[in-house]
Swiss-Prot record:
Gene name of the encoded protein: dapF
GO cellular component, one term: cytosol
Protein name from the UniProt record: Diaminopimelate epimerase
MF terms (GO), sorted A to Z: diaminopimelate epimerase activity
Binding positions for substrate per the UniProt entry: N11, Q44, N64, G74, N75, N157, N190, E208, R209, G218, S219
Enzyme kind, highest EC tier: isomerase
InterPro entries, per the entry: DAP_epimerase_AS, DAP_epimerase_DapF
């Protein structure tokens, strides 16, 4: 099986063309491939499949390193767009794909940065999903004897956003896993730790569901900005600095889609016997 190794700001992926190759991945096989010592090593596996709908170009599947399939990965979407062009699967700059829970439009700019229409952020708790009696801008939660104030949003996957004074000292490794698997998130959640620098600039670290802390989380950056705008902390265009680099997020508010722009890097091509 041929594959490519790619990354978006250090969030790394094994990308596989299932349009011209016959492939099947069991959860156990994905876990073995994800092993950084005995496999290829990656945060997520991205699979390019033929479209299910004639109006679309491809179907986009995402698997975490633990073998679980998820519906959204923003950094992966940028790599997906670069991959299908690099491999000659399309020459379009505007690429329409379906995912497990919807559709996305990926635009490859002239400078090879990729702009992703992430759809409209969803704050309704039952749709995140998040257990709450009603929608709030800020929720009060309890985790390991401490009170946590957070915002909750879905960007096609669930995000919990916690504002902190300094991301460098944020309790990502301790509070992250507790919140990820909190009983109020029936499908678990990605946990963002957000430091607001000013209305147009945040710093962010993300403990990703099923992957742990990563160098960057595209949907996490989108979720953090959406929550920040909803809470009145941020403007409509925001620079997000993650450990792996910078993303630019734009959202005009309710009724509008959110856009993420950032890089996608091809590292190498490989061949593996399964």
């Amino acid at each position: 099986m041929q594959f490519s190794k790619m990354h978006g700001l250090g969030n790394d992926f094994m990308v596989v063309d299932a349009v011209t190759q016959n492939v099947f991945f069991s959860p156990d096989m994905i876990r073995r491939l994800a092993d950084r010592h005995q496999g290829v090593g990656f945060d997520q596996l991205l699979v390019v499949e033929p479209p299910y709908d004639p109006d679309l170009d491809f179907h986009y599947r995402i698997f975490n390193a633990d073998g679980s399939e998820v519906a959204q990965c923003g950094n992966g979407a940028r790599c997906f767009a670069r991959f299908v062009r690099l491999k000659g699967l399309t020459n379009k700059r505007e690429i329409r794909v379906s995912t497990a829970n919807g559709r996305m439009v990926l635009t490859v700019n002239e400078d090879e940065q990729v702009r992703v229409n992430m759809g409209e952020p969803v704050f309704e708790p039952s749709l995140v999903p998040f257990r709450a009696n009603k929608a709030e801008k800020t929720y009060i939660m309890r985790a390991a004897e401490q009170t946590v104030l957070c915002g909750v949003v879905s960007m096609g996957n669930p995000h919990c956003v916690i504002q902190v004074d300094d991301v460098a000292t944020a309790p990502v490794e301790t509070l992250g896993p507790l919140m990820e698997s909190h009983e109020r998130f029936p499908e678990r959640a990605n946990i963002g730790f957000m430091q607001v620098m000013n209305t147009e600039h945040i710093r962010l670290r993300v403990f990703e569901r099923g992957a742990g802390e990563t160098q960057a989380c595209g949907s996490g950056a989108c979720g953090a900005v959406a929550v920040g705008i909803q809470q009145g902390l941020l403007a409509a265009q925001v620079r997000v600095d993650l450990p792996g680099g910078r993303l630019d997020i734009a959202w005009k508010g309710p009724g509008n889609p959110l856009f993420m722009t950032g890089p996608a890097t091809h590292v190498y091509d490989g061949f593996i016997h399964l």
